[in-house]
Amino acid sequence: MRGKLSRRALGLGAAALAGTGGWTGRGHAQTAPLKIGGLLPRSGFLALIGQACQRGRDLALPILKDMGYSVELMNADFESKPDVARTQAERLIREGANILLGAFESGATLAIAQVAEQHGVPFVIDIGSEPSITEQGFKFIFRNFPTSVILANNGLSRFSDIFQASGKTPKTAVLMHVNDTFGQSMLHAIDAYAATGKLPFKILDKISYDPQAKDLSIEVAKAKAAGAELHMVVTRLNDAILMVREMVKQRYDPMGIISPGSPGMYDLQFLKVLGKYADYCITNVPWLDPKQELNSRLARDFHKAYPDQSYDLNAGFSFEGMLICADAYRRAGSTKPEALAEALRQTKLEKRVMIGGAIHFDVKGQNPDQISAAVQNLGGKPVPVLPAANAEGKLVFPMPGFDQRG
């Protein structure tokens, strides 16, 4: 299949060069490219998503070159294991990485953050939502992705928009969620939001499960037995597929399947494997901005390079991570950690790929201004349906029953 990443391309320490020097910032010329140590789970149970993120980084190289940036990408696979992420981060630093970038999985991202802070090396988090990472007073950590609290709050507030737009509001819901670091942090955020009384429905039951589970029949049966009108989920990719397959098998037809902000249901593999049963699932997540010229360029390059793959937030945030690193280097004019960190603190990128305002970081190193769109699978593709300003399709809610789809 075209677009599939070879082992050679993904080899540890593989480097790709984008651009040459020549720009002067703060009176210092860029005499060498910035070495970005990129960490992702390109093997193990998160491999498909890790490889999707890698595509966004790889495509950033020629685009950044055209923009006049000078960067080199050093790749490392942490095999979907946080302990391996730690050792890989240490290896990249030993081999000369000036800045680290990663890492999708929250446990691994936290491990890398600890290594980066210990060594005084800047770490840009392109995807990773564990709240504690930016609550520990770290000086070298900068996150462009929303925390699970921001993600959940944005996603849960979008539920009311969905119900208002459709004219249908469920009174009850059941929650199925993964029990890993990400799933637990999302659960805490959902509980906190529910305690405010802002949820338009009552959660009747909360069902946790291992994201590496091979069978979810018991969990789905329990969810069905709750008798809730809405099925709310916090998933990864493989478990999301298992869950919907089991819902079809057990003839469990809620009004809708909605995530307040998790991967899985908008991923290409989910759409391919489940076919018509993947349609009408909704995920409330940060999404690509159709009005940004940089997004148009990235989308065009992506579809040309990977015609069989899905262009989604994994590629978008991964690209933005590369852009953030390159922009900081150009303004710092130096690869010294302190200079890069100071430049990162002053980041203000109006031209970006994702919806939301300019990329910037607060005193904790967090971009606080990300927003979420309601992204619904329609006709085998993830399509933003809300807010209206970013919509590219029309919301369908409640969803048709599984046995009513042609």
Question: Predicted segments — roles?
Answer:
Residues 16:
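Alpha-helical DNA-recognition elements
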